Each structure stands twice: as structure tokens, then as C-alpha cells.
Amino acid sequence: MKILAKWLTLVVLLCTTPAKAALDIVITEGVDAARPIAVMPFQWQGAGAPPQAIADVVMSDLVRSGTFKPLDELGLPQRGIGALAQFDANAWTNVSAEALVVGSVKPYGADQFLVSFELIDLVKAQNQALKGSANPTELLMDSRQTVISATQFRQYGHRISDIVYEKLTGIRGAFLTRISYVVVNHSQKAAYSLMIADYDGYNEQMLLRSPEPLMSPAWSPDGRRLAYVSFENKKAEIFVQDLYTQVRTKVSSFSGINGAPSFSPDGKSLAVTLSKDGQPEIYVIDIATKAIKRITNHYSIDTEPSWYPDGKSLLFTSERGGRPQLYRVDLNSGKVTRETFEGEWNLGGSITPDGRSMIFVNRTNGKFNIARMDLSTRFMQVLTSTRLDESPSVAPNGTMVIYGTTHQGKQVLAAVSTDGRFKARLPAGQGEVKSPSWSPFL
């Protein structure tokens, strides 16, 4: 309970604005193929109305995962139940869903609420009903009870979604993560805003506003800091900003290009692109000491570095073969290996957290789309069919990619599952949105 309370406090520190969605989520493909699941509205055991409907958050999360499809509550049997003790397996024999989420909320002191939830195995329940047996304890896949405040309903809903997702898929849920992005609104004097929001667009927070471009936000592995490029001083500079204290540090301000920061897996260094010695090359900067090490040395452009999960290699984009392609450089030996060959261009790559795949922008027949390549088989799959796709960023559980694209003449964010089945757009209410970056687990 103490660990969860500490986690909820950290989340609230980051969520400093009212709970509203700055980015809409418009699902465009993939819901029909998702796995059916039942989510019952949580029983409210108090006067008036609860501060927020937790079940709505859970259902939205599961839909947006691309993996699950919550059934219409109006068609469910036993509407209104809030615990396994009220569950009747015989009533669920004709429901095509693998699990049921039930729960309750009741006041628990001043501005405190006790939230209980249970995950029930419907497949086992249906088997028990067919056999005429009854063993409720075998049906319980998970059960939690937590005291939260009125401001923590949405965050705890994401926590429940994480638990449900992991229990049913074996993959850690990423609903308690955040995204950073740049909003551009040329109707304002300070047209560029660096923003952070929950993964679903709620609880937006502005880190910086500037009349000059902001770009390339990148999260530290602990989720406490953000690196980005700012032109606020009329030149490209790289900053690292603490998201809790708001203190920021200038890491790189050389002449020419200072761009594409990427945190090392241990959070101590940044891989960056600098042109201080002539052509754009890849460097690694120690954040604490500012010590700098040159990694590549080639007459062609080298840019967009990202780290392999083990921290021993970098993936980067280079034109050394004549056109932009992705290369790997071993940080110990300096050996460079070309990684991509299909299509006209391949750029802006990163390695998935499990180290098994590469996500990048592929250009084929003049079209820029997000693609995935299996690093063992080298099989490449184009994931998107949107226009002018760029800046892909992978969720920390490796199941989804957020990226920038163009829709109806405007820059927007979009998301696609790493198997290509689920697709969604994330348009902003005002301005254009670009340069997304998905946080680590928080």
C-alpha cells in the first residue's frame, strides 16, 4: 500500500493541470479483430455521484491498446455487480469474453475512497457452469484494494488497466505512461510549446513556450528528465530539464548543428548529432561532466542516434551509402554495420525495448511510412498507410508506436500497434502537433 501511495504521489506531481484531453484519440482500424472483454461499471457505495467513473478509464485503455474490445455494458448479464461474491457463473455461459472486470468504490474518510476490483476468468466460469461445479476461488485472476484521493481516480484506473492487460497477455501494460510532443500554433507570438501529457492526452503540462522552434524531445530512462533541442537563443542548443523541479541544464551549444538527443540506458549520457567539426556526426556527451566523445567520422551526414538496449551500440541514420539508411556502430570497436536495405530510404530508427525489432521510417515509391524489421529474420513490415510519417517512438512495453504524420493538411500525431493491426489518430484541439516521444514506465 505504501509503495502504491508513493507512486500515486509521483504521478500527481506530473499532472498539474485539470484532467481533460488535450489530444483526441480517433481509432481508425483494428477494433474488430480485438479480444472481447467485459468491464462492469464499478459499484458506488456512497451518497451522490463518485468523483469519476473508473470503469470508463479502464474500458478506454483496453480499446486503445488494440488488444481488447470491451463489450457493450447494456448487453451484459448481472448488471450492477461489484464483486466475485455476487457473480453467478450460470448467467455468463453465453457471453463471448475471456474475462470480467468488476469493482466498487466507497468513501473512506475525508476526500479518501476505497477502491476494490477483481478480475474474473469467464472461460473457467463457463466451464464450471457446464460441468455443474462451482469453485469461485478458481475464477479469481487478480484482486486489489487501494485507498485513493478524489484527484487520483484517473491514474488508478490506468493502474487497473495495467494489471488487467498483464494478467491476460503476459505483457506489462503501458497505460501509466506519458508522452511529450511539440505543439505549433502560428496564431500565437510564442508559436512553439513543449508539452507533456498522459499517454491518452489527458493532464497536459507545458514545459516551455518559445517564439523559436523546439524539437526532438527525449525521455530519460527514469522518466524524471526530458532532453530537447531549443532555438530560443537564435541557435540550436540541447537542454536537459528535470520534470519535477523544472530546473534545466544546457548540455550542448556548439556552433552549427546540436540535435537529436537520446539518453543512454543508464541515463548518464546523451547521444547527439553535432556539426562542430564539419559534417554532422554522432557524439556521446557525459551529462554530468560534459565530456564529449566522437563516435562516427565520415564525409557523409550521420544523424538521429538511438541506443540499443544494452548500451553497447548506437543505431543511426547515414547517407554514406548514397541514400539515407540505418547503421549500427559498436561503441567499443567503432565498427559500423549497415542494417537496412529495403526501400528507397530508411531513417529515424530505434530498437524496441526487448531488443528484437527495429522501428523506423521507410520510404518506398516516394511514400514515407512507419515500418518494423525483425532483427533475427530481417523481415520488414510496413505498419502504416498515412502520409509523410515521421518521428516514431515506441511504447515501453513494445506494443505500440506513436509518430507524427499529416492529416487534412495538418501535422498530427498517430499511433499504430507493432503488428500493424490497430491504428489511431491523435489530433490536437488547437495548432499542429509533432515530435512525439513516449516515456518509459513510470
From Swiss-Prot:
It is found in: Periplasm. Residues 1-21 form the signal peptide. Part of the Tol-Pal system, which plays a role in outer membrane invagination during cell division and is important for maintaining outer membrane integrity. One of its GO terms (biological process) is protein import. It comes from the Bacteria. Belongs to the TolB family. This is Tol-Pal system protein TolB. It comes from Shewanella oneidensis (strain ATCC 700550 / JCM 31522 / CIP 106686 / LMG 19005 / NCIMB 14063 / MR-1). GO terms for cellular component: periplasmic space. InterPro entries: 6-blade_b-propeller_TolB-like (IPR011042), PD40 (IPR011659), Tol-Pal_TolB (IPR014167), TolB_N (IPR007195). The Tol-Pal system is composed of five core proteins: the inner membrane proteins TolA, TolQ and TolR, the periplasmic protein TolB and the outer membrane protein Pal. They form a network linking the inner and outer membranes and the peptidoglycan layer. Keywords: Cell cycle, Cell division, Periplasm, Signal. The keyword Signal applies.
